[in-house]
Amino acid sequence: MHIAIVGTGYVGLVTGTCFAEMGFDVLCVDIDEKKVEQLKRGVPTIYETGLEMLLKRNIKEGRLDFTTDLARAAFGSDVLFLALPTPPGGNGAADLSYVKKAAGDLADLWAGSSDSGYHVVVNKSTVPVGTADAVREIMESRKLNVGEDFDVVSNPEFLREGVAVADFMKPERVVVGTRSERAAEIMRTIYEPFVRQGNPILVMDERSSEMTKYAANSFLATKISFINEVANLCEEVGANVDQVRKGIGLDSRIGNLFLYPGIGFGGSCFPKDVQALKRTADEYGYDFKILDAVLNVNDRQRIQMADRIVSSFGGSLEGKRIAVWGLAFKARTDDVRESPAHYVIQELLKAGAQIHAFD
């Protein structure tokens, strides 16, 4: 089974490397020539625990390669994963331009060939409900036949930055969205080595799969905003939020994960995905009230932290030197996207502070 990964960002690089580690022949495609050359040397473009070792080993053993040539991937692979950026647009909706362009480029290549064979196109990116349908329509518009020339699958990632390699190698579950039994069987085959410990491969329709990813991230973000609200109230009433957190976290119905109060969530996923799910609800005329609260609380946490620091020095930080430990949005990663620390630092600088930051 030959696998191609279109996009070598965080998700694409981890996905491709881990499939290669399990013995598959993997070709990763990216338009950035410098990035491709760096990866071909075995030098990762992101920091992720255990990734560099696997990258070097699989390149050396000939299972993993990198290229800028999409045609090489299109005609040399059975399964093609689209692991492309879906950044938020001005209205909060996910920008699907990269995904749609890749789908169109692949369709053009296959449509121009007399015998391109059958391919499974997999949306690995976090995408709104209906994206699989959109990709399918793009390919059908090139006169490709669904079920004969191609099938489209939704296969969201559930990787935690910092432990993404471990998450991919031993997933708690694999979600596969497709109405094609042929495509579903291929997906079972490539994921079977990862679930030998008995964790499930859940096959469902594409829209349910796409919703699963957004619902999961939005629920985790909700837990963070909830415990931050509890922490704020604890300060008012004289309670210890750490004790409260432990008290509720030992309830098996709740669990203790994501119940750590702080200055709010950040990163490339939670803020974007909560906004995108809210935007989806708006498009369908549904008022998803709790998501507004989650985002509002999260914004308030970082504002509140900066305000407290400034007010504790009488409203001015002129001449003050402040150390900031931690710039990434979470531990064990170098990802600073949407990091709450950056907002706090900017506010402290505006108040006249000198910042000494460490990570």
Identify the function of each model-found stretch.
Residues 1-359:
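Structural/interface elements that position substrates and couple domains in central-metabolism enzymes
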